[in-house]
Structures are given as structure tokens and as C-alpha cells.
Curated annotation (Swiss-Prot):
InterPro entries: MPN, Npl4, NPL4_C, NPL4_Zn-bd_put, Ubiquitin-like_domsf. It is a peripheral membrane protein. Residues 246-383 form the MPN domain. Belongs to the NPL4 family. The keyword Cytoplasm applies. Involved in the import of nuclear-targeted proteins into the nucleus and the export of poly(A) RNA out of the nucleus. Has a role in the endoplasmic reticulum-associated degradation (ERAD) pathway. This is Nuclear protein localization protein 4. It comes from Scheffersomyces stipitis (strain ATCC 58785 / CBS 6054 / NBRC 10063 / NRRL Y-11545). The keyword Iron-sulfur does not apply. GO terms for molecular function: K48-linked polyubiquitin modification-dependent protein binding; ubiquitin binding; ubiquitin protein ligase binding. GO terms for biological process: cytoplasm protein quality control by the ubiquitin-proteasome system; DNA replication termination; endosome to plasma membrane protein transport; mitochondria-associated ubiquitin-dependent protein catabolic process; mitotic spindle disassembly; mRNA transport; nonfunctional rRNA decay; positive regulation of protein localization to nucleus.
Length: 577
């Protein structure tokens, strides 16, 4: 059901019909068609007739409902006409902190931070710094409609912006990439020609009630107002994704991980270490390159996994960091043999059941909250996460295949606010009730029916998990260049339950099997972690080992094998065997 918003300007009063769940940008586009300006960058809005207006483009990215606007509300527009005849008609931005570098603009109950100092000074991931400098324009060849030479350009061959919807549709790209989404928002909210103010384009949703509201009433649950309570929530499929693709550096990484199920029939959980790189199959895309899967302490079962305390997690992270890799996600198996004795497995996850269960959705959301994405384009310095969740299960033809996912920013916000929990149906999430510490607003989800019409449904008491899910693609490289050696397999950690033990005997056997004389066997993540736990090598010697693995300089290998610590290791191995 649409609402009508009224806009009063010096040219008259105009009525604009709007969908309550539509982006406010659509409302502004209708308004611009009625007044004598063409650029939203020059439009200012206020909810009071005699107050100075605020930049309208700062409200883009919010829905009409989130801005607290209702049917019949009046907003006051000020701007400089296209003729430029009246300079006094332009309203300057003012904030609650005049003569300072930052403040906020507000309409309804939404407050949007502004600053004159530009983006925040934070340390982003290298891939973000690279893609930030890339315009990401989609080049197009000359067409039969072009009437110019090879060096000319027209509307039929000019480059498209990386967020172009038609390009995504034609190339079957389901989600916009994170940096394409960021550039689109930045284009809407910040003018390239106006450096006097800056609005952070990214803002995480917040569905938690403000327990320390200062509007003069008692704290919740004894008092509540429109300033401290979250707005109604409408869940929709997220149109962008933080990571577009997951690439396993080599197929042996996956095969070694699945071997536990092949030998025992129990499920397995692992943490994926790697890095993020640009992904050229999607405009301004990002891929997670998985170099190793570490298996933390766990108790596997036929239909689940019980995680145990991971005492050396910080040590594993430190070794990975020295090698230039870090946690990029988690992976787990959900495999059941088909019983046909031909290597096939049951297909349990499909469109008629679920792709991630409700508990897995909650786990993914908590992991993403724990591994936040650092960005300079958010007022808080972070926005969502690049942490991925991969499940290895059966495909439609009984094959074993990985599938990679993330959950939406709405899922993260719902978990932060403790609004959702699991239910007895794996494909549905339960909406909690309000209590003394938790206020649950109206929650709905919106989808298109078979006629292409938008239908909104009440999410209480349960709603489908698919509205919080973001799917990624995954693959193995055609010409793999892994960081770690794939020909030598050291015993993987925490597999004692089926007689695979990490001990000095395993180290001796592993090193003796390397006859290359080039130290290739040292380039194994599981071996490095175990060797660190033995404390045989000194700190400088272990750093030398990591430098050799990272840079593959033969001189470093020679210095390592001639070091006192390495000599001690060889002596201990000879005596232990």
C-alpha cells in the first residue's frame, strides 16, 4: 500500500506517491521531475517550515518507513533554481555542532552523520585499497547503432557503471559486488564538486532498542519513545554481497578435509585460512582464496559436530599472519552415503528444503559479527563482514560439492539485537518476543509472487531463512599456484580418533620422505603449526623458517638447516625413532 508525501517549495506544493519500503531515492526522483532542478545534490529538505534544510542525498539508502515518514507528511524543500536568479534560495547545511568538523542531519527519527573531513582513517584490507582506486567501468564494444569513428563514443558504447542492473541481468550476476554497491551509494550521497561536507555512504542496520534514551522518560521497559525504539523491519533479499567467489587454491585442500568422512563417516569442521583478492568475473568483485583448512578440536558425529575448546587459536592466527594469510571463513561437511556403493551421496540441501539451516544461519551471523569488515566509508569504521561459510554436501546428481554462503547485514543486526533464534523447522527462523532487555518491533518479509507483484508477509512467529542468505560461487583454479606444497601431506591436527597422530615420529617420517633437498616439505601449514608447538626451534629460527615458506629463497633454507635449533631438532628426531 503506497503513501502520499507532500513537498512544499517556492514553486508550489507537490504530492509524491511512495512505497513505504522503497528507497527514498525513488521519492526524490519523482520530486525532481516536478521542480526546476535536476541534481539531488542541490536539494535540501526539512520537516519544519522555517528551519534550514539538510542535504536530501544523505537520506538515500533509507526506506520511507525507516525515515519515520507517514502518509500525508509535509516536507519543505529548498534549492537553487536552474536559472540561478536568486542566490538566497540556497540553504547551507548546518549541524548540531556548528563550526566543528562533524555533526548529523536528521529527518523523522533517523540521524545521519556528516563530516567535513572525508572518510575515516582506518587500515583496510589490501584488496579494498586496490578496488577503491578502480572505477570499475564496464567497457562496451562498438555496436551497429554507433555513428562515429574508433576513437568516438556514444550512448550505445560508452562504459557502464559497475552497478548497472541490466548488465548484471544479461550476465546472470545475482548480486552486486560490495565495491560496486559502495560506489553507487557514494555517487548518490556525496558530490564530487562539493567538498564542504561528507556523508559516510555505508551504515549498518541497528535493530536494538536504546536503553539509555535521554528523551525524558524512564528507561525501557518502563518507558519508550520513537527515538529509542527500532523502526519496523522489512526483510528483503540483499542485492549486494561482500565476497563474490571462493577459490580453493588446489583440490587437494578439499580432498584432505573430506578424507575424515571417507574413513569414518563422521562430519568435520574446519577454519579456512587464505586471503582476499580481486575477482575479475564480476565488476569490482572480490574472491576469497583458501590456502589451508585448519581443523580445531572437535567431536564428530554421523549427523553433527561438537566443538571443543581451541587453546592454540591465537598461535595459529599468528603463524598465518606471518605468512600473509588470515581467517577467511569456515567449512563443514554434511555428507550421507547414498548406499548405492558407487561413491554418491544424498542430496539433502536444495530449493525445496534449505541451503543453510536456521542454526547455521545464526552461526554464520555470529562469525561475521566477530570478523567485521573494516572500512573507511562507514561512520563506525566497519560494515558487515567478508567472512564466508562453506558447506560440503551432496549435489543434485549425488556428487560431493562445496557451496559457499554469507548472511545479510539484516541477519547480523537481528542476531545483535537477539531478535531471532532457531526453530524445529531447519528452513525457518523464529522471531523472539519482547522482554525487559529486548524490544522486538514488527517484522515482515517481502517477496514477489507468481504474478511479479510484491507481497509482504508477517514474519512472526517464523519466516524462511532464505531472506537472510547470500549465495556465492566457488571453484578450483585451472592452473593452481598454491602457497603450500601439495605433494607432501603431513598428519593433520586433531585426528587422533582414527589413529592419525601428530608426534615426533610423524615429523621424522615426513622430513625423511622429502628427497628434493630444496625444503619443499617445510611448506606445509599443519607441519608449521605442530613444529611451533614443540618449541624446539628458537624464535629467530622459526621466523627464518616462515620467511623461507613465504618468499621461497634457497639461501634462507640453507641458513635454517645450519642453525643450532635445526641441528637440535634433527638430533631429537634421531633419538626418538
Amino acid at each position: 500500500m503506497s503513501v502520499t508525501l507532500r513537498f512544499r517549495s517556492r514553486e508550489g506544493t507537490f504530492r509524491v506517491a511512495a512505497n513505504p519500503d522503497a528507497d527514498f531515492l525513488l521519492v526524490l526522483e519523482q520530486l525532481l521531475s516536478k521542480i526546476s532542478i535536476e541534481d539531488v545534490q542541490n536539494l535540501y529538505l526539512s520537516d519544519k517550515p522555517n528551519s534550514k534544510g539538510e542535504l536530501a542525498n544523505g537520506l538515500c539508502g533509507k526506506t520511507v518507513t525507516e525515515l519515520g515518514l507517514k502518509n500525508g507528511d509535509m516536507l519543505y524543500a529548498s534549492y537553487e533554481a536552474a536559472t540561478g536568479s536568486n542566490p538566497d534560495s540556497t540553504t547551507n547545511i548546518t549541524t548540531s555542532t556548528n563550526n566543528h568538523n562533524s555533526g548529523s542531519i536528521s529527518i523523522g527519527h533517523i540521524s545521519i552523520p556528516t563530516t567535513t573531513s572525508g572518510p575515516r582513517k582506518v587500515t583496510q584490507l589490501p584488496v579494498d585499497d586496490v578496488l577503491e582506486k578502480d572505477e570499475g567501468l564496464i567497457k562496451r564494444p562498438l555496436t551497429k547503432f554507433c555513428r562515429h569513428g574508433a576513437k568516438g563514443m556514444c550512448e550505445f558504447c560508452s562504459p557502464l557503471p559497475p552497478w548497472d542492473a541490466n548488465y548484471r541481468k544479461e550476465n546472470a550476476i545475482k548480486h552486486m559486488s560490495y565495491h560496486a554497491y559502495l560506489k553507487e551509494l557514494n555517487e548518490l550521497k556525496n558530490s564530487k564538486h562539493n567538498s564542504s561536507s561528507y556523508i559516510a555512504p555505508l551504515e549498518e542496520p541497528n535493530y536494538s532498542i536504546l536503553l539509555n534514551c535521554n528523551e525524558g522518560h524512564q528507561p525501557y521497559p518502563k518507558g519508550i519513545c520513537s527515538k529509542c525504539q527500532p523502526p519496523p523491519i522489512t526483510l528483503q533479499l540483499q542485492k549486494f554481497r561482500m565476497v563474490d567467489h571462493v577459490e580453493f587454491a588446489t583440490s587437494s585442500i578439499m580432498n584432505n578435509f573430506i578424507d575424515v568422512w571417507r574413513h569414518t563417516g563422521v562430519q568435520r569442521f574446519g577454519v579456512m585460512y587464505g586471503r582476499y583478492e580481486p575477482f575479475d568475473k564480476v565488476p569490482l568483485g572480490i574472491k576469497a582464496v583458501v590456502e589451508a583448512i585448519y581443523e580445531p578440536p572437535q567431536s564428530g558425529e554421523l549427523d553433527g559436530i561438537t566443538m571443543l575448546p581451541w587453546e592454540n587459536e591465537a598461535e595459529v592466527d599468528a603463524i598465518a599472519s606471518e605468512l600473509g594469510i588470515y581467517k577467511v571463513g569456515v567449512v563443514f561437511t554434511d555428507l550421507t552415503d547414498s548406499g548405492q556403493k558407487n561413491g554418491t551421496v544424498l542430496c539433502k540441501r536444495h530449493k525445496d528444503s534449505y541451503f543453510l539451516s536456521n542454526l547455521e544461519i545464526l552461526m554464520a551471523a555470529r562469525n561475521q559479527i566477530q570478523h567485521a569488515n573494516i572500512t573507511k566509508f562507514s561512520s563506525s569504521g566497519q560494515f558487515s563482514s567478508k567472512f564466508v561459510t562453506c558447506v560440503i554436501s551432496g549435489g543434485l546428481n549425488g556428487e560431493i560439492e562445496p557451496r559457499s554462503y554469507q548472511v545479510s547485514t539484516s541477519a547480523e543486526a537481528l542476531v545483535r539485537a537477539d531478535i531471532i533464534t532457531g526453530s524445529t523447522q531447519p528452513s525457518r527462523l523464529y522471531v523472539n518476543s519482547s522482554n525487559d532487555r529486548r524490544y522486538v518491533p514488527d517484522v515482515a518479509y517481502s517477496e514477489l509472487n507468481e504474478y511479479g507483484l510484491e507481497v509482504k508477509s508477517n514474519a512472526k512467529p517464523t519466516f524462511p531463512v532464505d531472506f537472510l542468505l547470500v549465495s556465492l560461487t566457488d571453484s578450483f583454479p585451472v592452473n593452481p599456484t598454491p602457497m603450500f606444497d601439495t605433494d607432501s601431506n603431513f598428519v593433520i591436527e586433531n585426528r587422533d580418533f582414527f589413529n592419525e597422530l601428530q608426534n615426533l615420529h610423524a615429523v621424522s617420517k615426513y622430513l625423511n620422505a622429502d628427497t628434493s633437498g630444496k625444503g619443499t616439505s617445510l611448506c606445509n601449514f599443519h607441519f608449521l603449526v605442530y613444529l611451533k608447538r614443540t618449541n624446539i626451534l628458537g624464535a629467530q629460527e622459526f621466523d627464518l623458517l616462515l620467511r623461507f615458506v613465504r618468499e621461497r629463497q634457497y639461501e634462507d633454507y640453507l641458513h635454517l638447516v645450519e642453525s643450532p635449533g635445526w641441528m637440535t631438532l634433527i638430533t631429537i628426531l634421531e633419538q626418538s625413532t
